[in-house]
């Protein structure tokens, strides 16, 4: 087992010992063999390695004198040894590691996991933290691995169906617009509300229908959400004297402020994308609290700097009857700062994506 600074065994909820997984520990070898048995004997197709988040440092008693171990320096080796063991047991096994509270994603994202998996807990409370988590995970993995957020929605357990539903729509939009994936839903309208998966809640049928539409929307526009060449320029290309993107209205934010239209901007050589999420009517920006239905925003005008003529501007939303893209009318403007296109989004309910084909 691992020991605390008092040289007492670490216990979890007074039931489990927190075991020593440092390199050379007998428990580490035992653990990897158990993982292999789960593949070969129980028929699992992969392994989800879990942690408690605490402790991050612990004492090992494997030698004559207690030795302080930094777990962030041990996990990557454990992951990579597990990967090797699984590949000896099966073809193409899946392996993920739970970075509880985003720790230690800076190290584990570089390991041989198939995706960067983060269980989201306080103090990552706000919508802007959701974006931060996804951006950092992409950076640490070299933008080579999917980012999955296990962000459990307590409102389905503690608040009204309507407030919980709106929280789910907005959080889905937030995660997908920033190129992440959300672990939330299960079979038969089940929804995760806390870390113990067996204690789940059930979504109303009408909420499940909308969520299905949101996921269909995500799949339909995979190239707009998950193209790894899309670079987020939200903090550098709008506001102040950044003329690349301009809003003809005042209640916008790139930081997911309550009461405003949250704008995320991502672009590459072929596309300029604006992801619009309606936080108007939200009294706060905590992703894990129920939300009132957003106040519909109308006639949102944008002006975007372009290098030449474009192919077209298109708008799509899962909040409409159809998720099909609609062509937007636009006009060119030329001035001393260059060439621009201006266009208007007629309505924003919860989530809308606008993309310019260059």
Predicted segments, located by residue:
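Active-site-adjacent "subsite" loops/lids of carbohydrate-active enzymes
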Residues: 1-42
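Substrate-binding cleft/loops of secretory-pathway carbohydrate-active enzymes
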Residues: 48, 55-57, 91-137, 157-176
């Amino acid at each position: 087992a691992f020991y605390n600074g008092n040289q007492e065994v670490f216990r979890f909820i007074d039931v489990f010992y927190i075991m020593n997984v440092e390199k050379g520990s007998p428990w580490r070898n035992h653990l990897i063999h158990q993982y292999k048995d789960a593949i070969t004997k129980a028929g699992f197709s992969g392994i989800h390695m879990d942690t408690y988040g605490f402790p991050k440092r612990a004492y090992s008693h494997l030698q004559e004198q207690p030795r302080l171990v930094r777990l962030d320096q041990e996990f990557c080796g454990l992951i990579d040894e597990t990967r090797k063991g699984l590949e000896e047991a099966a073809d193409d096994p899946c392996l993920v590691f739970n970075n509880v509270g985003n720790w230690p994603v800076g190290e584990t994202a570089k390991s041989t996991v198939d995706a960067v998996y983060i269980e989201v807990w306080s103090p990552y409370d706000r919508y802007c933290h959701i974006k931060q988590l996804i951006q950092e995970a992409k950076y640490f993995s070299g933008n080579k691995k999917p980012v999955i957020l296990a962000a459990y929605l307590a409102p389905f357990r503690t608040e009204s169906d309507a407030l919980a539903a709106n929280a789910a729509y907005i959080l889905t939009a937030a995660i997908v617009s920033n190129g992440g994936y959300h672990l939330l839903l299960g079979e038969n309208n089940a929804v995760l509300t806390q870390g113990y998966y067996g204690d789940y809640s059930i979504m109303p049928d009408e909420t499940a229908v909308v969520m299905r539409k949101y996921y269909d929307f995500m799949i339909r526009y995979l190239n707009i959400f998950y193209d790894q060449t899309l670079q987020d320029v939200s903090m550098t290309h709008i506001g102040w004297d950044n003329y690349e993107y301009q809003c003809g209205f005042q209640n916008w934010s790139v930081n997911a402020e309550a009461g405003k239209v949250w704008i995320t901007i991502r672009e590459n050589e072929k596309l300029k994308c604006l992801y619009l999420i309606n936080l108007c009517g939200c009294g706060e920006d905590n992703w894990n609290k129920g939300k009132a239905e957003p106040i519909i925003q109308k006639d949102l005008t944008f002006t975007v700097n372009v290098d030449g003529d474009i192919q077209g501007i298109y708008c799509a939303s899962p909040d409409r009857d159809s998720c099909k893209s609609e062509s937007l009318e636009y006009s060119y403007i030329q001035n001393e700062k260059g060439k621009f296109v201006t266009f208007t989004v007629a309505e924003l309910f919860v989530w809308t994506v606008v993309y310019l084909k260059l």
